[in-house]
Each structure stands twice: as C-alpha cells, then as structure tokens.
C-alpha cells in the first residue's frame, strides 16, 4: 500500500477543533496552555478528512524513512497538547532568542525536530506556516549539513542548524534541528502543524541528530529520564491532554502502570501477546506480536487478518475481496482438513501450493526505511497472489476451531469475512445505533489484558440522526521477523496513560482518568 493510501487509512473524522487561549505557570515551575474547543458539524467532514489524511501521510512517510513511577509532577515540566479532531495532538514550542513560536506534533514514532525555514521560498506550504528566521536569533549557530527526509511521493529537504529550543519552561541549548526549505505537494500545505518534534530513540534520527529529549537529560533540565502522555478523549472537556517531562501526573491515571521492556531501540517497541474479541482469542498473536506505542498515529493499526475479524464482529463496512473468496472456495475445506489433521499451520499454504515459502522467511520491516521497503518488495516477489489470503484463512479457521464451531459454520464464517475486508482507503463505517451490541476488543501486554470498549474504539461524528461512526482499527501488514506488528496510536493511548521510561528502556500503561 502506498503512502497516500496508508494516509487515508489513518484518517479520523471527529467533532471538534482546539485553539490555544491562555498561558499559565504553576508554582512548581511547570508550564500549561489553556485550551478550548470549537465544535464542528458533520458537514465539515470532507474538509477535515482531507487535512487529517495529509497529516497522516506525513507521519507514515517520516516513519518509512527511519529505521514503579509515581509521586507528584513537581520536578517535571508539563506541555499541554491541542487535540485536532482526535486525530492528532499538538503542542507549542519555541526556537531561538527571542523565542519564535511553532505548533508541533510530539511524536514518539520519530526522533528529529524540524520546522519550516525562513529560507523556504519556493514551497507554497511555507507561506501558510510559521517559519524560523535565524537572523532574528542571537543564539543561532550554523551547521551547514544538508538534510532530507524521504517519503512515498517525494521528500522534504533543508539543512541542519543549532539554536535554543523552549519546551514549556525548559530551554534546551544548542539543539540541532532541521530547517526545511522544500516541502512539496499538498501534504504540508493543509497540515495543521508547523513541524514535528520526535521523541523516539536516536537510532532512527535522520543525520544522527541528537533528539531534543536526549539534550533535556544531558543538560540536567529534568531529574528523571521519563516522560508521559495523557491524551484527553472527552469531547466535553476543554483540555486536549498533556506531556509531562521528567515524571508523571498522578491525577491522570489510576492504579499501577504495567511495564514492558523495549525490545528494539529506535521506536518504543515491545512484545505484545494475544488480541481478544469479546474475550475470545483471535489466535494471531498466540506466539507473540510486536507493538509500537506511537503518539503520532491516530488509530490502531494491525494485521489485516485480525482487523478483518474485528470488522465482522462490529459490523463494520468493508470491501469484498474476490481473491479471498476464491481461495476460500477452492481451498477452504482443504485448509480445514489439514488443521484438523494437526498439520503445522505455518506450512499449510506452502503445502497446498499457494505460498512459495514455509513461514520461516525473513523480510525487512517496511516501517524502517525506504531501502528496507524496496527489499521487502523484492523478497515478497515470490509470493503468489493467493498467498496472503491463504495465510489469513488459516488464522480465521484456527480461531473458529478453538471455539468448537462446526465445519459448515467455519466455512460460512470465513466467507463472510472475505466480504468485510478492510478498505484500501482505510475507512470502515459502523452503525452508531449498534454500539451497545459491539464486543470489547482487548490487547494482552505484560501479562495483563487491556480492554477497549466500543465507545473507545469507535469514533463518533455529530449527534442525533446525522451522527456518523468510524472504526478505530485499520490494517497494516508487517511480515516476520519484524512482524506481526501493531501500532498502538491515540485510540489506545487515549484510554491508557502511557509512560516512556528512557532510563529503564520500558513502556508503561495504566488506565487514564
């Protein structure tokens, strides 16, 4: 799937827009920005869809280039966030002396800081966003090193510079960042942000630049190597959320955090267990999946096989996959018989001739880099068109066998799923009146089950007879050994307060309040 299609897959349409209204300082030295919301009606959906889609195009593009906490927050610095349509959370930073203000995405899925340059003359998008002017800053230092961040339909480019970066009340000295001088296309023109501040590990930083977060620690600006996210999903609240640098804010979560170790530096990636629908195992992650906690992704992205099962369970719209139906019609009974004969599931599709490998191949994770993406294409060239459909059918049949379904019921079930495959455009509508009948979807992390109720994974636009509802799940397929992979975006982080513990290299989740 290309970046444009992937962008649509992450589009979210909800009902409000936030603007900064006031600034305030707390006695403990933290910094907050007051927020308010401007409600949007469903008639604005097309316009907001376009903007959100382009923002997610950028997120996917940038990502494709890159390879016992408690107490009060008195020693922490708090940055409030602006919630744009529940699709993205923004905050304000400043660069230079005197400070030049920018609205940025605080993104745990990347590691660079970039903003438009005052030297960006030939990209229309630069004229619609705040631009950094080095000549106006007494703390500016020249680097001269060129920078380019590639994405599916082009790239943004510019050069590195150094200056003071203000985040809340913290001033990070001599921070390396990218001044962009070329921002082609509509992606950046319609974006609601000026730039991006990455909170991932340095391993995925373009140009090996030191991330802002690293310099906060090196310069002794915070006492604890921890930051945490609270994303407010309450449509009636004026607060969009907040990041706490240096700790956590106890008033935004209840109970204890469940921590899991980071398994691969770069992204905040960890091992995840089974995914459950109404308490029943989907079987897909029985032997483990990887997951990334990503504040820059709006929805929950996961393997098509599981998202299709969720679609069916919640009655989501989808598309009919003729390839899927053909495989089920011709090989469904054979796959069922082989599973009943206890054939190793990973070998079934190669055994019946639909896949040219036996499930033990290795393919680079497309999320890491453009080069890896090309390698993935060439590696997967061996696969026949029916191979992915066969692999999904194996998963679906296994899940039904575990529930002791009859053979006739199993064949009907997988045929029904073939008619509810996730749309290439990513949008899956659901019936708002059926929310109370939809199942809980759960994720197993660190041995604990984290539930999402229908009202938490379904995004509602408008009220009354004009209300529209969209599923918060979208498809993303990453093959082994990097996958299967889930990206736990804002839909998940909105329900669960998230701690990014840099010192112990772990991620923690607790119920948000």
UniProtKB/Swiss-Prot annotation:
SMART domains noted in UniProt: SapB
GO BP annotations listed: lipid metabolic process; proteolysis
Propeptide regions on this chain: 25-71
Disulphide connectivity of cysteines: 120-126, 285-289, 324-418, 349-390, 355-387, 432-469
Signal peptide (UniProt feature, chain positions): 1-24
Keyword Acyltransferase: no
Coiled-coil segments: none
GO cellular component assignments: nucleus; plant-type vacuole; secretory vesicle; vacuole
SUPFAM superfamilies found in the cross-reference section: Acid proteases, Saposin
Residues annotated as domain Peptidase A1: 89-510
Glycan attachment points: 404
EC id: 3.4.23.-
Transmembrane portions of the chain: none
Main location: other
Keyword Glycoprotein: yes
InterPro entries noted in UniProt: Aspartic_peptidase_A1 (IPR001461), Aspartic_peptidase_AS (IPR001969), PEPTIDASE_A1 (IPR033121), Peptidase_aspartic_dom_sf (IPR021109), Phytepsin (IPR033869), SapB_1 (IPR007856), SapB_2 (IPR008138), Saposin-like (IPR011001)
Name of the molecule in the record: Aspartic proteinase A2
Organism name: Arabidopsis thaliana (Mouse-ear cress)
